[in-house]
């Protein structure tokens, strides 16, 4: 498997390139982004630690969902909305993530299994709500679609050492505000910078794992950046963290 980083691959929107150009050269922050194949199982997740141990003053890791997870979540949302049974797919995906949690946190010191189980309890509740919902279901659908990043970010945080090892976790929906744009989702930079500054002042992180793909609207409703949006997330957070470098890793 290759461990060579690819700087802003083809999947990144053109807007991401302009954001990187705006990064200040004097920053001492490095952002790493890992896609679904790089967090596909416990072995690959554990292999990330030496890649991000790069000597930067601030290290940021943006993660996608485990390989195949988003496709499964999209299918479950469609099944729920159309009145079909989604329980088998939910159980299988839950067990895959719990098994990975057990491999990473076998002694339970990070409380990883319980945290991931809560994510899937929330997914089940969202699917039940979606099955009976009327009107605008877009926020519910977005919550379902983004569950994979919530869980994978927990897995990666624990594998890197967890809070005891200095690694914090940021749910991007806490700070990243977006709106519909002419070429897809656009960033509300004013709102995002304000929320990010507040979060950073409280946390003062030197190492943080961030959920890719997910965001929120100004009214707090959950949304996403669209398929393959985690590269876009990485570019956005490189800007917010004033990073000197963004590395997008593939197939590690």
Tell me what each language-model feature is:
Residues 1-252:
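Nucleotide/pyrophosphate-binding catalytic subdomain
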């Amino acid at each position: 498997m290759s461990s060579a980083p690819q700087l802003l691959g083809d999947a990144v929107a053109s807007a991401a390139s302009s954001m990187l150009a705006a990064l200040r050269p004097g920053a001492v922050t490095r952002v790493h982004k890992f896609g679904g194949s790089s967090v596909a199982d416990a072995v690959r997740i554990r292999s990330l630690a030496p890649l991000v141990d790069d000597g930067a003053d601030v290290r940021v890791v943006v993660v996608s969902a485990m390989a195949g997870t988003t496709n499964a979540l999209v299918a479950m949302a469609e099944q729920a909305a159309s009145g079909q049974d989604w329980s088998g797919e939910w159980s299988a995906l839950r067990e895959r993530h719990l098994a990975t949690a057990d491999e990473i946190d076998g002694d339970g010191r990070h409380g990883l299994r319980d945290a991931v189980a809560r994510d899937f309890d929330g997914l089940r509740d969202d699917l039940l709500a979606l099955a009976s919902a009327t009107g605008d279901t877009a926020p519910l659908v977005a919550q379902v679609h983004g569950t994979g990043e919530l869980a994978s970010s927990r897995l990666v945080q624990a594998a890197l050492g967890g809070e005891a090892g200095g690694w914090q976790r940021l749910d991007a929906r806490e700070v990243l505000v977006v709106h519909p744009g002419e070429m897809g989702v656009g960033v509300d930079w004013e709102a995002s910078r304000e929320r990010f500054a507040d979060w950073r002042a409280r946390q003062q992180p030197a190492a943080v794992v961030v959920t890719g793909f997910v965001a929120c609207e100004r009214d707090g409703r959950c949304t996403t950046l669209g398929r393959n949006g985690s590269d876009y997330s990485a570019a956005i957070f490189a800007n917010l963290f004033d990073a000197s470098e963004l590395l997008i890793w593939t197939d590690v």
